[in-house]
Amino acid sequence: MVKVKICGLRRKEDIEYANELKPDYVGFVFAKSKRQIEVEQALDLISLLDKEIKTVGVFVNEPVENALKIAQTLNLDVLQFHGDETQDYIDNFKNFTVWKAIRIKDKEDLEKTKQFKVNSFVFDTLTKNEYGGTGKTFNWKVLKGMELNVPIILAGGLNENNVEEAIKIVDPYAVDVSSGVETEGYKDFKKLKSFIEKVRGIR
């Protein structure tokens, strides 16, 4: 079954939604964005989170020392690097599960995967000057038939109306959603429920 990651949690209500709906992963964004969260705030929220749900820290070009400190303070399960990080940068996090985001415009962008040795790749939409959470999709067909020796996580503009089609085309390990389950900038329980039900209903 395809796994689900809900990204950009920042309120107690978001944690309550997650505890009820049981996504496989939840993401906390530590990069500058409208979903950015402070470490102390994340610590409080994680203390309320069902222990079965894995935690992902999302970073964009964060200094190594800062990212390590946050990861250790919060005991994060996964570190997701969503910026211009290099393999040399990623080598500082050998004790962690690491996902590297690759921003896709066309098939040529897939060549970037050859630069990295990571646990998974997150494929997201390439949008100028933005790093994720844009609500924009890319042409999923560029991923069709692609063979990688690590799992694929599909992101970029997913919502309850297109996630089934996306999964059929890409067959990812997991799908990653943020803006697609929000209303007016906040996580929406009904959209979350519908999204997760659609993913888990696929056979």
Swiss-Prot record:
One of its GO terms (molecular function) is phosphoribosylanthranilate isomerase activity. The keyword Transmembrane helix does not apply. Its EC number is 5.3.1.24. It holds the Pfam family PRAI. Keywords: Amino-acid biosynthesis, Aromatic amino acid biosynthesis, Isomerase, Tryptophan biosynthesis. The keyword Isomerase applies. Pathway: Amino-acid biosynthesis; L-tryptophan biosynthesis; L-tryptophan from chorismate: step 3/5. InterPro entries: Aldolase_TIM (IPR013785), PRAI_dom (IPR001240), RibuloseP-bd_barrel (IPR011060), TrpF_fam (IPR044643). One of its GO terms (biological process) is L-tryptophan biosynthetic process. It catalyses: N-(5-phospho-beta-D-ribosyl)anthranilate = 1-(2-carboxyphenylamino)-1-deoxy-D-ribulose 5-phosphate. Belongs to the TrpF family. PANTHER family: N-(5'-PHOSPHORIBOSYL)ANTHRANILATE ISOMERASE (PTHR42894:SF1). HAMAP family: PRAI (MF_00135). This is N-(5'-phosphoribosyl)anthranilate isomerase. It comes from Thermoanaerobacter pseudethanolicus (strain ATCC 33223 / 39E) (Clostridium thermohydrosulfuricum). The gene is trpF.
